[in-house]
């Protein structure tokens, strides 16, 4: 168990170093996803199933993909960073030393029987769907309304509906008047 923890911890550190050292932002997001997946697998191997799955859903499925969409929408040309960042090395080494000293001086085993008995994802799911089922339904309705609102906000105001009353697609038809009037301009 300790060796798995060390392997995934080193994977997180290596992927995090690649995030900040890769010049291409798309590859940087890729390494960020790998760091998040390593953290999720580390949590799952420690018996914290719920936190590991939340890491995958929230961080990999939402935040990293949002970063990727923003990077692809901005479409900045590749810039080569010619600045020397070696003056940050002493600060980075001192932060690493501080974290290492805090970790080595912390108590090795911290146990809480209440937390230890509720780490199973099945217990959390059964508690959500039996005791708090009304809140789950309300949350799903709020998310549905938010999704419909996002679709309506993203729709352009002057664009026609996708289909007419006969079920034919309106986007595949061409506007003959616009084509004729463009030829004479």
UniProtKB/Swiss-Prot annotation:
<keyword id="KW-1278">Translocase</keyword>
<dbReference type="GO" id="GO:0031966">
    <property type="term" value="C:mitochondrial membrane"/>
</dbReference>
<dbReference type="InterPro" id="IPR001457">
    <property type="entry name" value="NADH_UbQ/plastoQ_OxRdtase_su6"/>
</dbReference>
<protein>
    <recommendedName>
        <fullName>NADH-ubiquinone oxidoreductase chain 6</fullName>
        <ecNumber>7.1.1.2</ecNumber>
    </recommendedName>
</protein>
<keyword id="KW-0813">Transport</keyword>
<feature type="transmembrane region" description="Helical">
    <location>
        <begin position="87"/>
        <end position="107"/>
    </location>
</feature>
<feature type="transmembrane region" description="Helical">
    <location>
        <begin position="54"/>
        <end position="74"/>
    </location>
</feature>
<feature type="transmembrane region" description="Helical">
    <location>
        <begin position="28"/>
        <end position="48"/>
    </location>
</feature>
<keyword id="KW-0496">Mitochondrion</keyword>
<feature type="transmembrane region" description="Helical">
    <location>
        <begin position="134"/>
        <end position="154"/>
    </location>
</feature>
<comment type="similarity">
    <text>Belongs to the complex I subunit 6 family.</text>
</comment>
<keyword id="KW-1133">Transmembrane helix</keyword>
<dbReference type="GO" id="GO:0008137">
    <property type="term" value="F:NADH dehydrogenase (ubiquinone) activity"/>
</dbReference>
<keyword id="KW-0830">Ubiquinone</keyword>
<keyword id="KW-0249">Electron transport</keyword>
<keyword id="KW-0812">Transmembrane</keyword>
<keyword id="KW-0520">NAD</keyword>
<comment type="function">
    <text>Core subunit of the mitochondrial membrane respiratory chain NADH dehydrogenase (Complex I) that is believed to belong to the minimal assembly required for catalysis. Complex I functions in the transfer of electrons from NADH to the respiratory chain. The immediate electron acceptor for the enzyme is believed to be ubiquinone.</text>
</comment>
<keyword id="KW-0679">Respiratory chain</keyword>
<keyword id="KW-0472">Membrane</keyword>
<dbReference type="Pfam" id="PF00499">
    <property type="entry name" value="Oxidored_q3"/>
</dbReference>
<feature type="transmembrane region" description="Helical">
    <location>
        <begin position="3"/>
        <end position="23"/>
    </location>
</feature>
<dbReference type="InterPro" id="IPR042106">
    <property type="entry name" value="Nuo/plastoQ_OxRdtase_6_NuoJ"/>
</dbReference>
